[in-house]
């Protein structure tokens, strides 16, 4: 079972053999959601109004991959396994203050003040193994040569904004 009859070029696995000995999987999990709070007041008058609004949202997901080339595959005669994945978490926060003042029939003052924060975190993990020790156990733990790596990145963006108008 660890040798194959191939009628194509020597770098292409036989289709039936590959189905029995090679595997490729992808698994993903995801969560996302948002919420907001809003407060409004007219200060007991008809010509002033203040709105304060806070919004927060999150998008978090993990995807893991596994690529297995079984013992006897044409590209890696003694087998090859790769498991890699990434996790991403992106949080967004927005706070705004909106003020409106009707000074008189001719003038209206509007003000907007805000702050936005976007925080993104990415984690990558990879493990690769070559040359399986035993045929029939196509798994990363069976590799005689093993390499792994991990990378973590974080990016934070902050923005402040304001607008004033008198019309």
Feature names for model-found ranges:
Residues 39-41, 58, 101, 117:
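Short beta-strand segments enriched in hydrophobic/aromatic residues
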Residues 1-32, 155:
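Acidic/polar loop-and-plug regions of large Gram-negative outer-membrane beta-barrel proteins
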Residues 25-26, 30, 70, 74-167:
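Outer-membrane beta-barrel transmembrane domain signature of Gram-negative proteins
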Residues 49-53, 68:
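Composition- and surface-driven signal marking solvent-exposed, interaction-prone regions
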Residues 42-50, 102-109:
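Short loop/turn motifs that connect adjacent beta-strands in outer-membrane beta-barrel proteins
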Residues 35, 52-56, 111-113:
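Membrane-embedded beta-strand positions of outer-membrane beta-barrel proteins
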């Amino acid at each position: 079972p660890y040798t194959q009859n191939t009628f194509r070029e020597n770098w292409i696995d036989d289709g039936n053999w590959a189905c029995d000995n090679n595997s490729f999987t992808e698994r993903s999990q995801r969560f996302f959601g948002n919420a907001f709070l809003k407060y409004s007041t007219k200060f007991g008058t008809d010509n002033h109004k203040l709105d304060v609004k806070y919004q927060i949202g999150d998008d978090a997901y993990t995807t893991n991959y596994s690529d297995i080339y079984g013992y006897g595959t044409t590209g890696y005669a003694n087998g090859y396994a790769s498991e890699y994945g990434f996790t991403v978490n992106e949080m967004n926060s927005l706070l705004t203050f909106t003020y409106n003042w009707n000074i008189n029939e001719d003038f209206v003052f509007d003000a907007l003040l805000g702050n936005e924060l976007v925080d993104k975190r990415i984690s990558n993990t990879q493990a690769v193994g070559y040359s399986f020790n035993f045929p029939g156990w196509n798994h990363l733990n069976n590799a005689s040569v093993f390499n792994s790596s991990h990378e973590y990145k974080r990016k934070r963006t902050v923005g402040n904004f304001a607008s004033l108008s008198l019309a």
